[in-house]
Amino acid sequence: LVSSGATIIARTHAAQVKHMNEMFERAILHPGFAVVETLSECTMFNPGSFDDSIPRKGGVFDLVNEEEQDLESVAAAMDLSQDLTPGKFGVYYETKRPTKNELEREWLTDARSKIGDLSERDLLRQRFASMR
């Protein structure tokens, strides 16, 4: 997911509604490409498969300690993601980088300074015409 440009990656569980809402809210408010993996057991084929992570069933909902975890480290995020039993929950990776919209605005501003005050549509038409 990092190679696809994700700037925040988190894992939550459907049985932990408060945590799930926190992760969704954090992802929505994060500027950039956000991914929240939401685990949910299939009661038909794998009943009880996530009992180890549900406190009301005797399990432990193990959270990522963001104070100790280097959230900007791709290697640390990969290490967390390798534990499939069901692993830790929370934010695995978070970084700041320019968003697509910010880069596009920068490109448009730069293009306008070179070409003149054209509309965004006219700038794109001119750019595509130059590629022919």
Q: Where on the chain are the PLM-derived regions?
A:
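Generic beta-sheet signal
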Residues: 32-38, 89-91
